[in-house]
Amino acid sequence: MEKLNYQDSVEQWGLWEIEIPGPSTGNPFKEQTVKAVITGKNETKEIDGFYDGNGKYKVRFMPSFQGEYQFHVTSSFQETAEGRFRVTEPSKDNHGPVRVAGTWHFAYEDGTPYYSVGTTCYVWELQSDERIRETLDNLKAARFNKIRF
């Protein structure tokens, strides 16, 4: 298998990604497959990859636990590849994914309460790139944590 591009470490609840070079001819979305099995001490996940354009295929994973992980990648176009990466302590502002807390509330994985503060952006797909950037800047300054469009 050609050289894979991946991170040696990622924080808990962060985004780990591996990039696999492959064919870009034909219809790579339908004609090719990529799959990874990722195993840590407390979890094993089988994840389908996707075509990201320009002959690049990717698999993305969010680790739930700290420690050593192994990955095993198979595809329809290359030999099998294996490797390792380490999951470190989450950063101060990374509280993990949002879950149901009790029956009526939400909390991040680490127990920090989650308060949904959001808005709706109508006809988003009809806006100019400039208007989209302006809107995203305004939303960021307003401290929204969700958007519906």
Indicate where each model-derived feature is located:
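Solvent-exposed, flexible loop/coil residues
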Residues: 33, 110, 118
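The substrate-binding groove and active-site-proximal loops of carbohydrate-active enzymes
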Residues: 117-129
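Non-catalytic, glycine-rich low-complexity segments
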Residues: 1-42, 47-50, 85-90, 96
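Catalytic domains of carbohydrate-active enzymes, especially glycoside hydrolases
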Residues: 131-149
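Mature extracytoplasmic enzyme cores
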Residues: 1, 108-113
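Structural recognition of the beta-strand scaffold that forms the well-ordered cores
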Residues: 114-118, 146-149
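Extended acidic/polar, glycine-enriched regions
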Residues: 37-110, 124-125
